[in-house]
UniProtKB/Swiss-Prot annotation:
A GO cellular component entry from the record: nucleus
Record's function text: ATP-dependent DNA helicase involved in DNA damage repair by homologous recombination and in genome maintenance. Capable of unwinding D-loops. Plays a role in limiting crossover recombinants during mitotic DNA double-strand break (DSB) repair. Component of a FANCM-MHF complex which promotes gene conversion at blocked replication forks, probably by reversal of the stalled fork.
Protein name, as recorded: ATP-dependent DNA helicase MPH1
UniProt region (Disordered), positions on chain: 542-576, 781-848, 941-1003
Catalytic function, reaction form: ATP + H2O = ADP + phosphate + H(+)
Keyword ATP-binding found: yes
EC number: 3.6.4.12
Length: 1187
């Protein structure tokens, strides 16, 4: 430990030295402590043992108390909500072995490997792509074309830089790669469509035989055109309509070219077409072309989302690869300040509106003090919000609304005075003044605030002054004077006939004023107005206001244009149709007019021609409009742009263009936008290499290339599409063509119709769906619980048909051959054994028709495969297996005296009698099948059979139950492929008094199964048979023969004659045929379980009880419960007689109670059964019931 002396002991220099030494020691000691702590921490981390997560030496043994079942039940969890079940001693009962709730899993659907595209491709052409060398090769075009093959591309290029060339090249190569797919070029207007047809056919050389033009929605052979062509030029509205009507398959479209893509906003048809195609396929390419994508980031992102754009290619006029290909374009600005006359008018207007502005300020509507700063758009926005506000009272709301409307009108007047001049202001203000004055005088308006404004002294003075100035001033605004000076200089320097000028302005009144001013110059200037199709807005009719229209009053006839009205004045009033627009443009190109004064109609898309000078009379805050205007010049030769500014126009223009350039730069870098994922159509193994070659233009395209008229281009292209039938002036007669039915297209790999959830899930560990299991359960339920024989027969037929379809052809041929042999042998025996009665048939009847045999296969039921029976088994066990034939047991079919047993797959038994021949009074032979009831088969002597006699129609009769002691043997063919010398035989009894043909219209006796008998609990005795023996009894009941069954089991109730009801339903058939009973007494044929109504009997014997649970209990899934009768539930003990009686109870589920009895019979009471005698008939099973 270091001890420092106090500073007071030291003096002078020693004291200073001590001070510094003490500080040094302090810092050294401090850093030493830090270093020591770091080293210690690292040592602890490196030497500390890591405790494994899985520690075998834990305290889990505490939870493994196996002696406490209640504690174990808590740990394992109890699914039941109630308390644990306990025994009489108080301990917790054992957990039931009944399976818990089934767990289900989703059936895995195999994932289909998606190929790059579903379109058919030409892989040989896919190795290369053609780049036309007909024009100059430009780097930016080359790069954009290659990029368009792999991405949905948005191309933003300045006007005149070859966007159409890029589209044509991409279309040409997609046509080579996807020869049967469709390529669609969409443009918003007909003139643009015509321009693109001319460009694509003259650049890429696409044959006209593959090109179609669709501009008419009413054309009736649209489906034929869509199916026969590959390249289509059309408008988006036409494509949207054809997609919605099912005329064109959306999955067949491989390329979609969109011109003027900046329109893809809102609910425009471009967006609807892309949305519709996306519903069916994403394997198609989009090429979007525009000069100005949007003025802000949100607009660009909206286009990207609507058109699924995955890549953006943007070039500006300052781009490196663009500059050297741009023509020199000089942009000149000129600011024109308002004249003194305009300033005087502005002051008078401000003096008149000041009281209204003060009222608006008091109400909090506007926060302005200078009336000259009133803005039209601002006032309209505030008024819209006020109307939409439900909290403002109605009176105050509409009062504020009219104030803002008046202020907005004044703001528009300011704009017209500052930008367009006095004449434009006069036209607008006079119309508003006349409208209000007329309504005020007619007492239709009570707005005192507006009256105070319009009838005030400043406004009256203003109107008089404007009227005077419009007559004396040569130019209404200094801009017009600057424009005239520019035109003078231009035409002096460009005296050639090819010089062209376009002047852009926003309002029609201003355009007409400019035209009139130019016309007054009387020189070589030839101007004309160029506006849209809509008519001039209908002005307020002062004369007819308030007058009622007379009934039947016709519209006024069109006023003929007076000779003093010029073409531009008439166009300004009536609008310009497309025909007139094309005529003006055609004359402009030819030099008839060399100046066009255009509104916004001339800004976008139109190829007006070579323009040397562009004058922007006004400017807007939209950079897109400004760029479109300036792009009309400098395409093929140098040009000049003159921007005329007034008031605050220049600042707005600079702000808009500066923001647009900023956005363009960030879009080029990929900032601020989120692109969609890429989807390749070309396989990854292919990367097409460029092949630069000169494109040979087909002869049919030369005519399109030489044509300049848009209508003529459309007509020529249409005539080629129709095979030369579409001549000018002729219309095809399509009246006989019917409207095609609408086609509904589905996406790839879609499943139509409804699909249940059960078909898509399965139990864990199962290989079949829940629906398939339910279907099997439903079939078993119908087989067990059905009261109608027809339902069982129908199910048997369906199962037989499914089994027959699954067999191979070789096995079926073998079965048919065996059936042929059997039928021939039966026919031969029948013919040869008749009792002296001739039954002649043609000789060719021995050959069975293959079609009839094949048809009869549907009516054949298959008996489950019997197994070989061991001779070592006891007689009773053999009888038990033969008698109680279930799917789990076997049948011994012996073959005559040889007593040989064979294992066969199935036995074919005809269950359907298709013979509906009418019967006579006599009856023929009857064939009856008798089960083998003993290991020893008695062979009866043969007896000739009498010829079959037809039955009577519709009369029920008793069946003669006295059998013939003699019978013949008929072989039943086996379905196995192995052939054997021995035949599996059945004993057949021929009865001369009966026939095997059923009578038409008479219900045949139906055998009743054990389940039906136990469910009904009828008082009269009934026969209970197994499922396998049921098919034999059904055949026996159809033949309606009877034969006493030999006693094979010592049963005290087996000798009872059984009455089988021929008519299972409870109708009143006996009332119709009263002379004949509806039932027949038939000796029982191999009964299994029988009940009697004797008082001393009421339950099964011990042997029958044992056989019931051995042969009829089948372990099935707990969810597939089958209604089953539990005999124990119905037992009751009589105290006097000390005997058990059988009660009449309903069906219960195949549950644990049945399982308990089954286990009891097999395992639990083996010791007690062993103590008894080995004679099964004398064994006592009542102790099971007692427990």
């Amino acid at each position: 430990m270091i001890i420092f002396a106090t500073p007071k002991v030291c003096k002078g220099k020693t004291r200073i030295l001590y001070f510094y030494l003490s500080k040094l020691f302090f810092y050294v000691y401090f850093f030493f402590l830090i270093y020591y702590s770091i080293q210690k921490h690292s040592y602890i981390n490196s030497t500390m043992p890591i405790i494994p997560l899985e520690d075998d030496k834990d305290d889990d043994w505490i939870l493994e108390d196996e002696d406490d079942p209640e504690f174990q039940a808590i740990l394992q969890g109890n699914s039941s909500k109630g308390p644990a079940q306990r025994t009489l001693e108080g301990s917790v009962a054992a957990v039931s072995t009944r399976p818990q709730n089934d767990k289900y899993e989703t059936i895995p659907v195999p994932v289909k490997i998606n190929t790059p595209t579903h379109h058919a491709m030409d892989f040989e052409n896919l190795k290369t792509y053609i780049y036309p060398t007909n024009f100059e090769i430009r780097d930016y075009q080359y790069n954009i074309v290659e990029r368009a093959f792999y991405d949905n591309l948005l191309v933003a290029l300045p006007t005149g830089l070859g966007k159409t060339f890029i589209a044509s090249t991409v279309m040409l190569n997609f046509l080579r790669w996807f020869p049967i797919s469709k390529i669609i070029f969409m443009a918003p207007t007909r003139p643009l469509v015509a321009q693109q047809i001319k460009a694509c056919c003259s650049i890429a050389g696409i044959p006209s035989s593959k090109v179609a033009i669709l501009l008419d929605k009413t054309r009736r052979n649209r489906a034929e055109i869509w199916n026969s062509r590959q390249v289509f030029f059309t408008t988006p509205q036409v494509v949207e309509n054809d997609l919605a009507s099912g005329v064109v398959n959306p999955k067949s479209i491989a390329l979609l070219v969109i011109d003027e893509a900046h329109r893809a906003k809102g609910n425009y048809s471009y967006n609807n077409v892309v949305k519709f195609i996306n519903r069916f396929s994403d394997s198609y390419r989009i090429l979007a072309l525009t000069a100005t994508p949007a003025s802000d980031v949100e607009g660009v992102q909206q286009i990207i989302d609507n058109l699924n754009i995955s890549k953006v290619e943007v070039r500006t006029e300052q781009s490196i690869d663009i500059v050297r290909h741009m023509k020199r374009k000089t942009v000149e600005r000129k600011t024109c300040y308002p004249s003194s006359e305009i300033t005087e008018c502005i002051e008078l207007l401000a003096e008149g509106i000041t009281p209204v502005l003060n009222t608006a300020k008091e109400r909090g509507l506007l926060d302005l003090t200078d009336p000259t700063r009133i803005n039209f758009l601002q006032c309209m926005e505030i008024s819209r919000k006020i109307v939409a506000n439900p909290t403002i009272p109605e009176g105050l709301k509409w009062s504020n609304y009219f104030i803002l409307q008046l202020l907005g009108m004044v703001g528009q007047c300011y704009r017209r005075l500052n930008i367009y001049g006095i004449r434009s202001f006069q036209s607008y203000f006079n119309e508003k003044f006349l409208e209000f004055k007329t309504k005020w005088n007619a007492k239709k308006s009570t707005n005192k605030l507006n009256a105070d404004f319009y009838f005030s002294d400043p406004i009256t003075t203003l109107m008089d002054r404007v009227e005077e100035l419009s007559k004396t001033l040569t130019y209404g605004h200094p801009k017009i004077e600057a424009l005239m000076e520019e035109l003078d200089d231009f035409f002096k320097n460009h005296e050639t006939a090819g010089s062209r000028v376009i002047i852009f302005t926003e309002f029609r009144e201003s355009a007409l004023e400019i035209v009139q001013c130019i016309e007054k110059a009387n020189d070589n200037r030839k101007p004309h107005i160029f506006i849209g199709q809509s008519k001039e807005k209908e002005k307020f009719d002062v004369e007819n206001f308030g007058k009622k229209k007379q009934k039947g009053q016709t519209k006024k006839k069109k006023d003929e244009r007076p000779s003093t009205r010029s073409s531009s004045e008439n166009a300004q009033m009536t609008g310009m149709s497309q025909k007139l627009q094309k005529e003006i443009i055609k004359k402009f190109k030819k030099g008839v007019f060399n100046i066009l004064v255009a509104t916004s109609i001339g800004e976008e898309g139109l190829d007006i021609g070579e323009v040397d000078l562009i004058i922007c009379y006004d400017s807007t805050s939209s950079p897109i409009k400004n760029i479109q205007r300036m792009g009309r010049t400098g395409r093929k030769r140098d040009g000049k742009v003159l921007m005329l500014f007034s008031s605050n126009e220049e600042s707005k223009f600079d702000k808009a263009m500066g923001g647009y350039e900023y956005i363009q730069q960030h879009i080029m870098k990929g900032d601020f936008i989120q692109l969609r994922p890429q989807h390749r159509m070309i396989p990854d193994e292919y990367k097409p290499e460029a092949v630069k070659q000169l494109i040979q233009i087909p002869e049919e395209n030369i005519e399109l290339k030489a044509e300049d008229d848009e209508d003529e281009i459309i007509r020529i292209a249409t005539s080629y599409m129709l095979g030369g039938k579409g001549k000018k002036g002729k219309k095809a007669n399509n009246n006989s063509t019917k409207k095609p039915a609408k086609t509904f297209f589905m996406p790839d790999n879609v499943e139509t119709g409804f699909k249940s959830a059960a078909t898509m899930v399965r139990k864990v560990g199962d290989n079949k769906s829940l629906a398939e299991r339910n279907k099997e359960k439903t079939f078993l339920d119908k087989l067990v619980d059905s009261d109608s024989e027809s339902e069982v027969d129908k199910e048997n037929e369906n199962v037989i048909q499914e089994v027959d379809k699954s067999k191979n052809q070789e096995q079926n041929d073998h079965i048919i051959t065996e059936l042929d042999n059997t039928e021939q042998s039966v026919a031969g025996n029948t013919k040869s054994t008749t009792n002296g009665t001739s039954y002649s048939e043609p000789e060719n009847n021995n050959q069975v028709n293959q079609e009839s045999v094949t048809a009869n296969l549907d009516s054949v039921a298959r008996v489950p495969e019997p197994e070989v029976i061991e001779n070592s088994e006891s007689e009773e066990e053999q009888i038990s297996k033969i008698t109680h034939n279930t799917p789990a047991t076997s049948v011994d079919l012996s073959n005559g005296p040889e007593e040989t047993s064979y294992k066969i797959d199935s036995v074919l038994i005809d269950l359907i009698d298709d013979d509906f021949t009418f019967s006579s009074d006599t009856e023929g032979d009857k064939v009856e099948v008798i089960d083998a009831v003993s290991p020893e088969v008695c062979k009866l002597p043969e007896k000739p059979a009498t010829p079959p006699i037809r039955k009577s129609l519709g009369v029920k009769r008793k069946v003669n139950k006295t059998p013939d002691p003699e019978s013949n043997s008929i072989s039943i063919p086996s379905s196995t492929t192995k052939k054997s010398h021995n035949e599996v035989t059945r004993k057949v009894v021929q009865d001369p008094s009966t026939t095997n043909k059923k009578s038409l219209g008479v219900k045949r006796p139906r055998p009743v199964s054990i389940i039906d008998q136990l469910k009904r609990q009828k008082i009269r005795s009934q026969v209970i048979v197994s499922r396998e023996t049921q098919s034999i009894i059904e055949h026996e009941s159809r033949t309606q023969s009877s034969l006493p069954s030999p006693r094979n089991m010592s049963d005290e109730i087996s000798e009872i004659d059984v009455i089988i009801d021929l008519d299972d339903d409870d109708d009143d058939d006996n009332k119709v045929n009263g002379h004949d009973k509806s039932q027949t007494t038939i000796s029982k044929v191999q009964p299994i379980y029988e009940f009697s109504n004797k008082e001393d009997e009421g339950f099964l014997s011990s042997s029958q009880t044992r056989e019931l649970y051995k042969n009829y209990y089948i372990a099935i899934d707990s969810s597939d419960d089958i209604p089953f009768y539990d005999p124990v539930q119905g037992f009751s003990k009589i105290k006097d007689t000390d005997k058990f009686t059988m009660g009449r109870t309903g069906p219960i589920t195949h549950s644990l109670r049945t399982q308990r009895l089954f286990q009891a019979c097999n395992a639990e009471f083996d010791s007690q059964l062993a103590a008894q005698t080995k004679d099964n008939d004398k064994q006592d099973y009542t102790f099971i019931l007692k427990k």
